[in-house]
Amino acid sequence: MKVIIASQNPAKIAAVESAFNLAFPNDTFSFEGVSVKSGVPDQPMSCEETKQGAMNRINNAKIKLPNCDYYVGLEAGIEGNSTFAWMIIDNGLTVGESRSSSLPLPPQVIDEVKKGKELGDVMDEQFNTDNIKQKGGAIGLLTNNLLTRTSVYQQALILALIPFLHPTRF
């Protein structure tokens, strides 16, 4: 089965691959990341905007690569002083959704994000890292790598897969 991931971010792709392989150990998947627009600002600043970005990514991936088995949209955002992400999975018949855990951000980080910077760029500046958003993410930095962007996204993706694990109940 072909799974299209509406992102080329390695951390997001790894999370999707892991979640699908754990949820469906007897199935064989091929995964492809595709670069598509979210249709929202680079740094979404509300829950609604973030969720819309994930859905827009799926819709744009369907246009770019039609007739695949699953489409997965992931979008990270900020609301208040926390960051989180929406996961949406669509197979044309069923849609599964889940929001990740929320991660509190330091006030200095929030101040810079409110000036229009992306969270990943701010984290790189303040923690002297390079392209952290494609690695462990802010989550990895702030939890001393007890959690990573991939591990937190994997959990949320498994929750979004529940309707596909129990299709007769949804």
Swiss-Prot record:
Obligatory cofactor(s): Mg(2+); Mn(2+)
This protein's UniProt keywords: Hydrolase, Magnesium, Manganese, Metal-binding, Nucleotide metabolism, Nucleotide-binding
Catalysed transformations (reactions): XTP + H2O = XDP + phosphate + H(+); ITP + H2O = IDP + phosphate + H(+)
InterPro entries in UniProt: ITPase-like_fam, Non_canon_purine_NTPase, NTPase/PRRC1, YjjX_NTPase
Keyword Manganese: yes
Any Pfam family matching the protein: NTPase_I-T
GO biological process per UniProt: nucleotide metabolic process; thiamine metabolic process
Signal peptide: none
Top EC group: hydrolase
Recorded superkingdom: Bacteria
EC number annotated for this UniProt entry: 3.6.1.73
Cofactor note as given: Binds 1 divalent metal cation per subunit; can use either Mg(2+) or Mn(2+).
Biological function: Phosphatase that hydrolyzes non-canonical purine nucleotides such as XTP and ITP to their respective diphosphate derivatives. Probably excludes non-canonical purines from DNA/RNA precursor pool, thus preventing their incorporation into DNA/RNA and avoiding chromosomal lesions.
PANTHER family linked to this entry: NON-CANONICAL PURINE NTP PHOSPHATASE_PRRC1 DOMAIN-CONTAINING PROTEIN, PTHR34699
Family from the record: Belongs to the YjjX NTPase family.
Subunit composition and interactions: Homodimer.
Name this polypeptide is given: Inosine/xanthosine triphosphatase
Organism: Aliivibrio fischeri (strain ATCC 700601 / ES114) (Vibrio fischeri)
